[in-house]
Regions:
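Core segments of cupin and vicinal oxygen chelate
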Residues: 9-59
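Vicinal oxygen chelate
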Residues: 12-14, 78-124
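Short, P/G- and charge-enriched loop/turn segments at secondary-structure junctions
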Residues: 66-71
Length: 134
């Protein structure tokens, strides 16, 4: 049973699908359980647990009655996907090769915790991702 998993609402579904379909198996051992780049929905699991779902933002906006509102506004990030990985540098390069955009390069952060290393990037739709190891 999935107690809680992330569902990203994306405007650039096909690009995001290709990005996550390329990086989630290597970063998290996730397997795609449904969906195609045609959308409007796709999901990846590790074992029986949901890891990530993508849903077309416009399709959900039509369901919940917000289609007339702007999809994007200039604000600071409100959420971040975080993935613990064995090698932050390799994970960062993997994500960049598949369409991720750098936000902050791999950096050791001892002030955050012993052995902590992080990198920050954005998926093709602009969602913030942190890769971390410790």
């Amino acid at each position: 049973m999935d107690v809680l998993h992330s569902r990203l609402l994306v405007s650039r579904f096909a690009e995001c699908f290709r990005f996550y379909d390329a990086v989630l198996p290597q970063l998290a051992g996730a397997v795609r359980t449904g969906g195609t780049e045609a959308g409007p929905y796709a999901g990846w699991d590790v074992g029986e647990e949901g890891v990530l779902r993508l849903f077309d933002r416009g399709a959900l906006a039509a369901v919940v009655g917000t289609a007339e509102l702007p999809a994007d506004a200039p604000v600071q990030d409100r959420a971040m996907l975080v993935s613990r990985v064995a090698d932050v540098d390799a994970g960062f390069e993997l994500c960049l090769r598949h369409g991720g955009r750098p936000a902050a390069p791999p950096t050791s952060r001892p002030e955050w915790g012993p052995g902590m290393r992080t990198a920050h990037l954005r998926d093709p739709d602009g969602n913030l991702i942190e890769l971390q190891s410790y």
